[in-house]
Amino acid sequence: EEIETPVSAETTAGNQAEEENNIPEQSSQTGENETNPDPTEAAAEKKTFTVEPNPQNFNQTGISFVFPGAIFGPPELIQVEGSDETEMGGPFPGFKYIKFDSYFQNFSIFSPDMLVFPAFDYRKMNEYANESIELLLTMVADPQKITNAEELPFLPSFNAAQVFHSNVEVVEFKNGKGLRYLTAYYQDYSPVTNEYLWYTFQGLTTDGRYYVSITIPVYHFGLPANYEIFKNSYKEDAKELQNDYQGYLAKIASMLDQSAQNEFNPPLIVLDEMIKSLQIR
């Protein structure tokens, strides 16, 4: 079965001009606004979300966690065969792929998922994975090393660059810990839009046996919905992007870092609670 993960996403923001301005539906959540904000007002007027999580239990093949039923439908676990190919993030051992169905938001090109790899095998057969896991262990042990890092660990790899990261925290789950952060990946000098923004958790069990990679799209009212909205309505940001891309990215990261957890949809605290409930055996 073909799985939809960031590994298979090759579209860049440069060809999004025909995309519609998709706004996240509120479903069982409530937001102060349900339409795209005027970009001139977005920074001044903060939008917040509240959610009644409706906690639901997942427990299959040694993986258990409590997920917010208000955000996700029943997750589906799929066993994925390993691959010796070096393309699309490989080589990698067989792993467990958890697909979150019935995700109510339609603003992102990505789907939320959880990947659980046997870490020893992964490290043995993939040098990039081994280096990423070593970097993760170093950063979790000494969070000061996160401060000046150009890139944070993310597995599996794919053919795009991590252009920024923000909202970084060390989060512990039932039998391990890792890094939670927001990021976007691009193949060119593209603006950060809600189509490409995601929350990720990269973690390792305490015994070192399992590596977990979680990716969940999130929405922030301070960002344009897509490239077309950015091009037409965010004139100053577009000018800054052309003149100083790194400065533009630093401004975006700072804006997200200074945002409260409930200024994101879904609220980051709700996603963090799901991470904290995770146990992998």
Language model features: what each stretch is:
Residues 1-50:
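Ser/Thr-rich, Proline-interspersed low-complexity disordered segments
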Residues 35, 208-209:
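Short, surface-exposed beta-edge/turn micro-motifs
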Residues 79-90, 152, 188-196, 222-238:
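Low-complexity, polar-biased intrinsically disordered regions enriched in Pro/Ser/Thr/Gly
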Residues 136, 202, 231-235:
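Short, low-complexity, polar/charged sequence segments that are solvent-exposed and flexible
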